[in-house]
Amino acid sequence: MATSERALLRTRAASLLRGLGRSRTGARSLQFRAEKERQPCWSFPMGQKTKGSSNIASSYLLQQLMHRYQELDSDGDEDQGEGEAGSEESSESEMLNLEEEFDGVLREEAVAKALHHLGRSGSGTEQVYLNLTLSGCNLIDVSILCGYVHLQKLDLSANKIEDLSCVSCMPYLLELNASQNNLTTFFNFKPPKNLKKADFSHNQISEICDLSAYHALTKLILDGNEIEEISGLEMCNNLIHLSLANNKITTINGLNKLPIKILCLSNNQIEMITGLEDLKALQNLDLSHNQISSLQGLENHDLLEVINLEDNKIAELREIEYIKNLPILRVLNLLENPIQEKSEYWFFVIFMLLRLTELDQKKIKVEEKVSAVNKYDPPPEVVAAQDHLTHVVNSVMQPQRIFDSTLPSLDAPYPMLILAGPEACGKRELAHRLCRQFSTYFRYGACHTTRPPYFGEGDRVDYHFISQDVFDEMVNMGKFILTFSYGNHKYGLNRDTVEGIARDGLASCIHMEIEGVRSLKYSYFEPRYILVVPMNKEKYEGYLRRKGLFSRAEIEFAVSRVDLYIKINQNFPGYFDEVINADDLDVAYQKLSQLIREYLGLTEEPAKSLATTADVKTSHLKPEAHPTKYISSNMGDFLHSTDRNYLIKFWAKLSAKKTPAERDSIHRQHEAARQALMGRIRPDHTLLFQRGPVPAPLTSGLHYYTTLEELWKSFDLCEDYFKPPFGPYPEKSGKDSLVSMKCSLFRFCPWSKELPFQPPEGSISSHLGSGASDSETEETRKALPIQSFSHEKESHQHRQHSVPVISRPGSNVKPTLPPIPQGRR
């Protein structure tokens, strides 16, 4: 006892001495600093201690402490032998106690502290603790657990256990966690019949033993071991989750027909994806950190939702083809693969796997999916819009001028007739026959194409056959109105083709595929679209085979597009103005010819095919009853509802009252535009600023004539405007040309039939009964010179003697254009 007290005092003295030494050193530093501070402070001379006073006090205290330490040291030397022997004995006893306390053997006291979750036993007869958690206790021997038969969940992770035979005595065990131990094998015990989850990760297991007795096992984790081959799992018919990460597996096998939903094989040495063909229930697959270079082997897994292939050797975009048909794939991770270096990687993968919601741990935005689709497989409408945009932008390369196809009247667009239909359905033959019969109205417009001519086709007759380089150059120069692709060839409608036909005062008749129709609908042209489609596909297929011009694949593709045309016509009412069955070309041409006659007004009955919707009720526009009516009962059938609505709105604008200043401004604008269209504008453009009366009638006000003599006089007043410097008949004299133009205004005016509206109040009535008798009108009409075209005579005999005429600006420019009313897009 005395020895221990002396040692304690010696220790305290030593510490005190060290503290004193530190305090002495600190005192010296403080003294030195105080001296330095006191030297310049001459303003405070009083109250300062001398330099030797502090040294005397500190030295006295130091001497006392050193003396006491020496006394304690001398006493300690006497008892040194006895103290060393006692310390050795005490240390040995302490080590023995520690060994007895941490021997790795589990005892009941520790078990009692680790039990939790009180519940009903497996037999249901008593209340017991169901869970035991002994994680991180450095346990080696857990044999005491043999008596705990009611356990259902056992956690022995992070210990040093080498034997788990005690688990054989736990028939109700459901979950076992034996991770991070020293196990070299597992399931070397009698299997609990209800064991569902087992975790043996991070042990020293080198092979998988036979688990055929573990029928109820649903989750098995064997991460971080030394397993080289998957085996022994064939009879685990309830196994859903299998994890073998961080092992030495090189080949995937031994998983035949197991109901595995989650499979983790990351951080192994796998080079090929094999052995997964029979895992039909697979939903989550982790093959990250391997050496896989191909995705082959992942096909036909319809339930696969998540694929993790991070840090592998996938390098080609074409590998995505193997997983593009997985219907519910949502998450894909290809980080740290060579494929990411591809410039098109992101949008290509999104396009191929449109159902993805997450790629490379990033959420995919809707805008990215739309951009990917528009880049690799744009919808037909997007293709048409891009084509139209391309040609509009490239058109600035051409000289800017007013096109010959630009008509001066808003309600009379340049007339075009488009025959659309599948390949070799007869639309080209119908177009040629139509242009031959109606040669004074239509001319065939040949498209440009990069394909070689078929047998019997002529260059510039059926198509303009050009090379791909020439075609691309024309696109870049902005010479096309539209282009489209069919098969492996390009087709395009040249601007010069349409303008050349319009320059001769004729309408264009063109045939094309549906792709060209879509692009043309984005332009400002408003043609009539007629669908020519064979309804009998077998007959159509036989016709293509007999021609001997197409391969089997081309024939099958052409026949398959018949349904496409029919579907478009059904899903988009009004997309085509008329549908003609092309099974019999003779019958089809008869119907087409009759339809064109009705369009041109060459028959007594107007075309009723355009009045498919109900007539618009405009009771406020109905005129009063009169023997010579202004409105025919069939006029509503002739005009489509869209046209009637346009006429109503247009008539409302024309009928609006305008101030004199507005009228003068409109007169000047229309006069300048008309002179420009006729090529009479002067270089200095001073005509735009001239003032004065406009000699031709304009749209600022409608004038109604009482007799044909008055109308004839009005033409004489503006005779100068009927003499354009160029025209379709340059060989005629000026007088004959003027007469023919006057007559053509009666015959080919789009509104030569009775108008569906009433003249405003106060205007002069245009019916002949109010100003002259029918006999006088007949004599006046016969006095007019008539052209000697037989079809015009037949058409003129069916017309009424009273012709209400609206003089439109520019109606005297191209009087030979056929009166095809405005279509709808």
From Swiss-Prot:
Segments for region (Disordered): 73-96, 760-825
Main location: cytoplasm
LRR repeats: 129-149, 150-171, 172-193, 194-215, 216-237, 238-259, 260-280, 281-302, 303-324
Domain Guanylate kinase-like: 414-597
Compositional bias per record (Pro residues), positions renumbered to this chain: 816-825
Role, per record: Involved in multiple aspects of sperm assembly including acrosome attachment, shaping of the sperm head and in the early aspects of axoneme development. Not essential for primary cilium biogenesis.
Name of the protein: Leucine-rich repeat and guanylate kinase domain-containing protein
Source species of the chain: Homo sapiens (Human)
Taxonomic classification: Eukaryota, Metazoa, Chordata, Craniata, Vertebrata
